[in-house]
């Protein structure tokens, strides 16, 4: 499949999608927990950031490869979207132009798309926030685009340092964006749920006043590293 990265002039109509209840569960667990649970992989570069706060989405990836400064394939991709999808877009070479604005967002909302992840720029940012259309982007840029060059829809692509396949699960919130492979969804969900349960137990202990030093049994390791305590600064004199 890696040989398909960068191919243009192709639209794949049918993609695998994970069961919605699994996607929703991963979304509730959040980016940080999912990222840790799957071995700290799948996290997009921190340059791709939310343009809003307090919003979390999780959905199936519809992937879009676009040419620099050209948003033609967005319009092609809209037709392939289903409710619960997340559009994942990357340019074939670096570009920060404003590929996406409120008109395309309106079209995607009408299809039930939850949000956009783009390794490039968007514009109409305040309107997008007012609409409640969630966006994670590399840039906010009023510079517009043209419609001349073919890209692809639903082929594998590299987005902000991560390989994304159509149908992979995209989890996005204030902490960033993480991708879960379609075939690993069940295992990652189980691991993330276990992690969340463990963290809740630790949270209760911390709230009761117990120290992380003791919960995580850090003292022996700190001592082995040479950490020492003194009662007063004057104890270090001489």
From Swiss-Prot:
Protein name: 4-carboxy-4-hydroxy-2-oxoadipic acid aldolase
GO MF entries: 4-hydroxy-4-methyl-2-oxoglutarate aldolase activity; metal ion binding; oxo-acid-lyase activity
Top-rank taxon, per record: Bacteria
Role, per record: Catalyzes the conversion of 4-carboxy-4-hydroxy-2-oxoadipic acid (CHA) to pyruvate and oxaloacetate, the last step of gallate degradation pathway.
Reaction catalysis annotation: 4-hydroxy-4-methyl-2-oxoglutarate = 2 pyruvate; 2-hydroxy-4-oxobutane-1,2,4-tricarboxylate = oxaloacetate + pyruvate
Cofactor(s) the record lists: Mg(2+)
Keyword vocabulary terms for this entry: Aromatic hydrocarbons catabolism, Lyase, Magnesium, Metal-binding
Phenotype of gene-disrupted mutants: Cells are unable to grow in gallate.
Principal EC category: lyase
Annotated InterPro entries: LigK_PcmE, RraA/RraA-like, RraA/RraA-like_sf
EC number, as in UniProt: 4.1.3.17
The keyword Cytoplasm is annotated on this UniProt entry: no
Cross-referenced Pfam families: RraA-like
Residues where Mg(2+) binds: 124
Gene Ontology biological process terms, A to Z: gallate catabolic process
Family to which this protein belongs: Belongs to the LigK/PcmE family.
Residues that bind substrate: 101-104, 123
SUPFAM superfamilies: RraA-like
């Amino acid at each position: 499949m890696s040989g398909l990265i960068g191919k243009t002039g192709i639209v794949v109509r049918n993609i695998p999608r994970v069961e919605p209840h699994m996607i929703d569960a991963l979304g509730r667990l959040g980016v940080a927990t999912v990222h840790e649970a799957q071995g700290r992989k799948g996290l997009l570069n921190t340059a791709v950031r939310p343009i809003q706060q307090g919003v979390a989405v999780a959905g199936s990836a519809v992937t879009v490869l676009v040419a620099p400064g050209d948003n033609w394939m967005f319009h092609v991709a809209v037709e392939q979207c289903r409710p619960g999808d997340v559009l994942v877009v990357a340019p074939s070479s670096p570009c920060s132009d404003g590929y996406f604005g409120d008109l395309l967002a309106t079209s995607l909302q009408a299809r039930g798309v939850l949000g956009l992840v783009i390794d490039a720029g968007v514009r109409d940012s305040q309107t997008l926030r007012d609409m409640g259309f969630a966006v994670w982007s590399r840039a906010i840029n009023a510079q517009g685009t043209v419609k001349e060059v073919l890209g692809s829809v639903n082929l594998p692509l590299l987005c902000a340092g991560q390989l994304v396949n159509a149908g992979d699960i995209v989890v996005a919130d204030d902490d960033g964006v993480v991708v879960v492979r379609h075939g690993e969804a069940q295992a990652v969900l189980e691991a993330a749920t276990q992690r969340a349960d463990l963290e809740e137990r630790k949270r209760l202990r911390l709230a009761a006043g117990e120290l992380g030093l003791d919960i995580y049994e850090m003292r022996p390791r700190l001592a082995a590293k040479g950490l020492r305590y003194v009662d007063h600064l004057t104890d270090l004199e001489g």
